[in-house]
């Protein structure tokens, strides 16, 4: 037997956790990154380097119904949140960029005030505007109507100091909304007029074709009927008088042939008969009977009387119904065999098959 050595001491844990240090809250050292998606800008514009913070719950009492209301309600709020999170260096840069962009926008608005062709932006949300501007179809449509007007609202979201943007964006939004309503109404009117014109043209063409066919048939048929009425009537009456006896004999011959074919091909159709039902009842009565308790059981008709059977092995083999016994007798007579040579009785009186040694 080996001696057990001294038990090893438990290794001390080298990591000690300070509960007081864990309870302290970590101070935020990094700036919060902007979670709002920036809208697409013009190629000449610069992207603002301002990080916006997303508010968890909207301010009470304000409901966004259009882009203009969104701009006016969010101008003062974004200024306070941005000035707290952005350093003084970034503020100076953004002020310079905002002034440059304001001068550029003034030139753009002066040249594009006459063209108020813009896509519908009055009833859409910023996410819808972003999706619409990112799609190539909307870009094509905006380029065709006028470059610059749909993008006038973009710097207003990120540079609220410029007062020109708000006025220009409101005017462009109102005009674009009115113009879109007018264009939609005009399109509906044009579609209705086109559909009505097509229907009228189809109806007119059908009527013209029908009238031309009627005129042609009247002009050609009227003259022909006047000339050929008498001759046609005489020819038709003569043909009918000639064909009448031939058709009558043909019909009589067809009727006789059909009757003969039906008589020859008529075979007994299996149908319901009361005799068959009676035969079925008789066969069922031969196969089944009632016991002392009135229950329906299989009838065992054997030569020997019923006895108390103790040998269960020979119980199912000896008793054969009369119908089956008759069939067996017929088969044995066909093969010139006697029934006594096939079956015998055991000590208990049951009919069993004879086994010759």
UniProtKB/Swiss-Prot annotation:
Segments carrying the region annotation (Disordered) are 72-102
Residues modified as Phosphoserine = 292
Query: Where in the cell does this protein reside?
Result: Nucleus; Chromosome; Cytoplasm, Cytoskeleton, Microtubule organizing center, Centrosome; Cytoplasm, Cytoskeleton, Spindle pole
Supply the alphabetized keyword list. Answer: Chromosome, Cytoplasm, Cytoskeleton, DNA damage, DNA repair, DNA-binding, Nucleus, Phosphoprotein
Taxonomic superkingdom: Eukaryota
Gene Ontology process terms (BP)? double-strand break repair via homologous recombination; negative regulation of double-strand break repair via nonhomologous end joining; spindle organization
A Gene Ontology cellular-component term: cytoplasm
GO MF annotations in UniProt: damaged DNA binding
Region described as Interaction with RBBP8/CtIP: spans on this chain? 281-357
Which residues lie in Polar residues bias regions?
A: 72-93
Q: Where is this region: Interaction with AURKA?
A: 189-357
Q: Does this entry carry the keyword Cytoplasm?
A: yes
Among InterPro entries, the record links this protein to: AUNIP (IPR029286)
On subunit structure and binding partners, the annotation says:
Interacts (via C-terminus) with AURKA (via C-terminus). Interacts (via N-terminus) with NIN; this interaction blocks NIN phosphorylation by both AURKA and GSK3B. Identified in a complex with NIN and AURKA. Interacts with RBBP8/CtIP.
The UniProt family comment states: Belongs to the AUNIP family.
What job does the chain carry out?
A: DNA-binding protein that accumulates at DNA double-strand breaks (DSBs) following DNA damage and promotes DNA resection and homologous recombination. Serves as a sensor of DNA damage: binds DNA with a strong preference for DNA substrates that mimic structures generated at stalled replication forks, and anchors RBBP8/CtIP to DSB sites to promote DNA end resection and ensuing homologous recombination repair. Inhibits non-homologous end joining (NHEJ). Required for the dynamic movement of AURKA at the centrosomes and spindle apparatus during the cell cycle.
Q: What is this protein called?
A: Aurora kinase A- and ninein-interacting protein
Species, as recorded: Bos taurus
Query: What does the organism's lineage look like at the top?
Result: Eukaryota, Metazoa, Chordata, Craniata, Vertebrata
């Amino acid at each position: 037997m080996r001696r057990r050595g001294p038990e090893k001491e438990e290794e001390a844990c080298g990591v000690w956790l300070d509960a007081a240090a864990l309870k302290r809250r970590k101070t935020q050292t990094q700036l919060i990154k902007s979670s709002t998606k920036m809208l697409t800008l013009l190629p000449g514009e610069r992207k603002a380097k301002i990080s916006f913070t997303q508010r968890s719950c909207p301010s009470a009492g304000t409901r966004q119904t259009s882009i203009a209301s969104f701009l006016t309600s969010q101008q003062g709020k974004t200024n306070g949140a941005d000035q707290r999170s952005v350093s003084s260096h970034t503020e100076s840069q953004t002020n310079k960029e905002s002034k440059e962009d304001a001068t550029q926008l003034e030139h753009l608005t002066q040249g594009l005030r006459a063209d108020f062709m813009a896509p519908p932006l009055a009833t859409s949300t910023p996410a819808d505007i972003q999706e619409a501007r990112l799609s190539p179809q909307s870009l094509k449509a905006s380029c065709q109507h006028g470059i610059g007007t749909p993008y006038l609202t973009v710097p207003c979201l990120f540079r609220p100091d410029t007062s020109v943007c708000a006025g220009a964006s409101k005017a462009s939004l109102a005009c674009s909304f009115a113009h879109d309503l007018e264009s939609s109404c005009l399109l509906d009117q044009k579609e209705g007029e086109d559909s009505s014109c097509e229907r009228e043209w189809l109806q007119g063409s059908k009527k013209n074709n029908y009238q031309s066919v009627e005129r042609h048939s009247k002009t050609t048929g009227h003259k022909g009927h006047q000339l050929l009425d008498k001759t046609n009537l005489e020819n038709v009456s003569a043909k009918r008088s000639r064909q009448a006896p031939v058709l009558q004999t043909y019909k009589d011959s067809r009727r006789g042939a059909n009757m003969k074919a039906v008589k020859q091909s008529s075979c007994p159709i299996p149908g319901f008969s009361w005799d068959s039902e009676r035969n079925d009842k008789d066969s069922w009565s031969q196969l089944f009977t009632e016991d002392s308790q009135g229950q329906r059981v299989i009838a065992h008709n054997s030569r020997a009387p019923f006895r108390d059977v103790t040998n269960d092995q020979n119980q199912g083999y000896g008793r054969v119904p009369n119908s089956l016994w008759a069939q067996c007798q017929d088969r044995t007579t066909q093969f010139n065999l006697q029934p006594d040579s096939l079956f015998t009785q055991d000590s208990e009186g049951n009919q069993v098959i004879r086994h010759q040694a």
